[in-house]
């Protein structure tokens, strides 16, 4: 049974055992574009990927399924070399502890996403990045574009253009890297992991 056949079964919930780890060659391949109309399996896969992210952010489901929390997942991490990503970035409480009006700042399954333009300025998360396919900490600034404009297709084949900045920009770039065979630590300065070039925006 292929990876996608297993994952799209109605009874299957994606868990950490389905996620391949660094060293697996699929993570270093440039994934193939999907064509439209999508196959039923490709559509269900996108839904399952989003379901995994929701489960990973739900304390009860995460404990039950043994999940690490995640805000993004790419099909190659499931050993499926297709250009499909899911992103789910929760909003946080305000300074007074009030819940956000919208639960998520970004919630989307993207097919064939690509960066079409970006800022000159670079940015990095102050705490570095992690990855569901990497079971170790890799300290250092992961240097990315501070702002990007992306294009992607939804499951119906409709094309979207989105401008992103801040954390959402970082998350989407991390996932697009996965479909291009790039790992986050490829973008860390090997000799000086916390090197700060002039103009680098550090995001807290």
Swiss-Prot record:
Fe cation binds at residues 131, 174, 178. It holds the Pfam family Pep_deformylase. The active site is at 175. Gene3D superfamilies: Peptide deformylase (3.90.45.10). This is Peptide deformylase. It comes from the Bacteria. Its EC number is 3.5.1.88. Belongs to the polypeptide deformylase family. One of its GO terms (biological process) is translation. Binds 1 Fe(2+) ion. One of its GO terms (molecular function) is peptide deformylase activity. Its cofactor is Fe(2+). Keywords: Hydrolase, Iron, Metal-binding, Protein biosynthesis. It catalyses: N-terminal N-formyl-L-methionyl-[peptide] + H2O = N-terminal L-methionyl-[peptide] + formate. InterPro entries: Peptide_deformylase (IPR023635), Peptide_deformylase_sf (IPR036821). Removes the formyl group from the N-terminal Met of newly synthesized proteins. Requires at least a dipeptide for an efficient rate of reaction. N-terminal L-methionine is a prerequisite for activity but the enzyme has broad specificity at other positions. It is an enzyme of class 3 (hydrolase).
